[in-house]
Amino acid sequence: PYEPGDIPFTGTPELLGGGFGDYAPGEWSDDTQMSLYIARVAATGADLTSREALDEIARGFCRWVALDGASDVGVQTRRVLDAVVDSRDEPGIAARMRAAAADLDAATRRTGGNGALMRNGIVGLTRLDDRWATAASARAVAELTHADPLAGDCCVIHAEMIRSAV
């Protein structure tokens, strides 16, 4: 992943690893890894606000942490996923994940981080003909891990920027 910082303009550029995690050169960041679970569900044409789609996304996030080798997980997202990962195969995982995110928000009042936004890009491409469906999808997916309404608002705006640009 590419992180902020100065890079000297000498020599031949090369792909670097590192960043905020122990990434190999060319390895995707944790946020990109998570966005692939959203993309897999979106690629089916599913309504990303539906219980079934959100359950599949939430299940994917949990599989990523438990089984697929998450290379790094943000502190807030880790706390939410850890609260539900053991019940990932039971029905209603998305509702339990949203409840865990809401509980964390109630306890800390500090859950407006950028994690939901970092994996939101794909959502802006899913309903190009419907800004309201795009907004609802962005908020629904964001709320799986980020209960602060500002996090959802940022995802709605970001998804709409992408949708309208396309």
Where do the PLM segments sit?
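Structured, active/binding-site neighborhoods that engage oxygen-rich ligands
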Residues: 1-166
